[in-house]
Amino acid sequence: MAKTLYEKVFDAHVVYEGKNELPILYIDRHLIHEVTSPQAFSGLKMAKRRMARADLTLATIDHDVSTKSVDLNACSDMAKEQITTLMQNTKEFGVRLLGLGDKNQGIVHIVGPELGFTLPGVTLVCGDSHTATHGAFGALAFGIGTSEVEHVMATQTLKQAKLKTMKIECKGQFQKGVYTKDLILYLIAQYGTAKGTGYAIEFCGELIRNLSMEARMTLCNMAIEFGAKVGMIAPDEITFEYIKGKEFAPKGEEFQKYCEYWKSLRSDEGAKYDASITLDVSKIKPQISYGTNPSQVIGIDEKIPKISDFKNQSEQKSLLDALYYVNLEQDQVIEGVKIDIVFIGSCTNGRLEDLKIAADILKGRKIHKNVKALIVPGSMQVRKEAENLGLDKIFIEAGCEWRYAGCSMCLGMNDDKANSGQRVASTSNRNFVGRQGKGSITHLMSPASAAACAIEGVICDNRKYLGV
């Protein structure tokens, strides 16, 4: 029977399936961080349990760490407590920790792939909703709750219902100035934040095969904003080359054997999907969010919708509520809206390729005098590689702040926050009410668009800086 990529990986990991019971999956990799792990470790201690496979667990500090310094004292009191607790728990249970000052510390969904901890065909979980990022490698990766974190620690297994499958085929090639961030925002804008609910998505097609691993990770990262639990891309030579030589990756002849197996991790010809979408990506323009959920997105040269554009009353109310919060009007042109802060970073767009894209636009230019721009590498490894290329100098000379690794302004859990009423051009993944600080206003976009906004001080078209 022909199978999809998702079905192949799922079926290969079922260790038990009783009658009228959910299948139990073996979990190959477990990533943890300081926010969702303390309760899980406490549960183990109360039950006097040890971890089943501490060697298959990797911990990092990312959510509430300071990006101004690698010193613990630079963190808030709550952050200090969470970080110290993780340090104690990982030491007690024998889990490797990428702590403050570690050369590999960074955002959980960036350090996993960087170290080769994420591999094709594995099951990978983390107490974080954007775990779908790792599906870019052909891994079955998804976010879990704190009680499930404890269950994986104790048993290295998890009960999981089998999802429906959806194929999203991407035909054509991007226009200049358009990136996978624009693609995923466009997809969510066209179909809504619930279209993927109950599905494992597989991205495929001409465009996908030509994408770098960094670009693929951006795409899978925001599958959750589309409503899907899982986003996957079949591994190929680009995947294998990215993994080769990394710390946790197989070595030598063993690596070649794994590559032969990984080549089988693609949907069979004739495999049936429960749903499918085909996109012509050549029509996509740089996308900008205007509201308070990731489906409220338009092209840079478009106007904000009018209430008459929606027939559904709930959609009409959602539009009015969003526009009231973000202080914008129906039928308003998005280009030219003043911004106060630019944030380039996060597990969506904090990789070296993202920083290169931003630096290409900022090189030899200055940011607007009324703009504060934060450039936050997703890991200390990304930071080092960027500095080796001189990107830090480009950012600093442009007037940006060059920070240490962390989640930073993606969420209001650390000191990097916007004040009430401040408008942020952000490369992160969510534009919810107060996401980047109480009363803050978020406009989601690509690193190229964010860099252009930093220069002009308003939402603008990045393509003017690319000779388009």
Swiss-Prot record:
Keyword annotations of the record: 4Fe-4S, Amino-acid biosynthesis, Branched-chain amino acid biosynthesis, Iron, Iron-sulfur, Leucine biosynthesis, Lyase, Metal-binding
The name this protein goes by in its record: 3-isopropylmalate dehydratase large subunit
Reported function: Catalyzes the isomerization between 2-isopropylmalate and 3-isopropylmalate, via the formation of 2-isopropylmaleate.
Family: Belongs to the aconitase/IPM isomerase family. LeuC type 1 subfamily.
Enzyme type, top EC level: lyase
Manner of cofactor binding, per the entry note: Binds 1 [4Fe-4S] cluster per subunit.
Cofactor annotation: [4Fe-4S] cluster
EC numbers on record: 4.2.1.33
SUPFAM superfamilies from the UniProt entry: Aconitase iron-sulfur domain
Pathway entry: Amino-acid biosynthesis; L-leucine biosynthesis; L-leucine from 3-methyl-2-oxobutanoate: step 2/4
List of residues binding [4Fe-4S] cluster: 347, 407, 410
HAMAP family found in the cross-reference section: LeuC_type1
InterPro entries linked to this entry: 3-IsopropMal_deHydase_lsu (IPR004430), Acnase/IPM_dHydase_lsu_aba_1/3 (IPR015931), Acoase/IPM_deHydtase_lsu_aba (IPR001030), Aconitase_4Fe-4S_BS (IPR018136), Aconitase_4Fe-4S_dom (IPR036008), IPM_dehydratase_rel_enz (IPR050067), IPMI_cat (IPR033941)
GO MF terms held by the record: 3-isopropylmalate dehydratase activity; 4 iron, 4 sulfur cluster binding; metal ion binding
Subunit structure comment from the entry: Heterodimer of LeuC and LeuD.
One GO-annotated biological process of the protein: L-leucine biosynthetic process
Catalytic activity as recorded in UniProt: (2R,3S)-3-isopropylmalate = (2S)-2-isopropylmalate
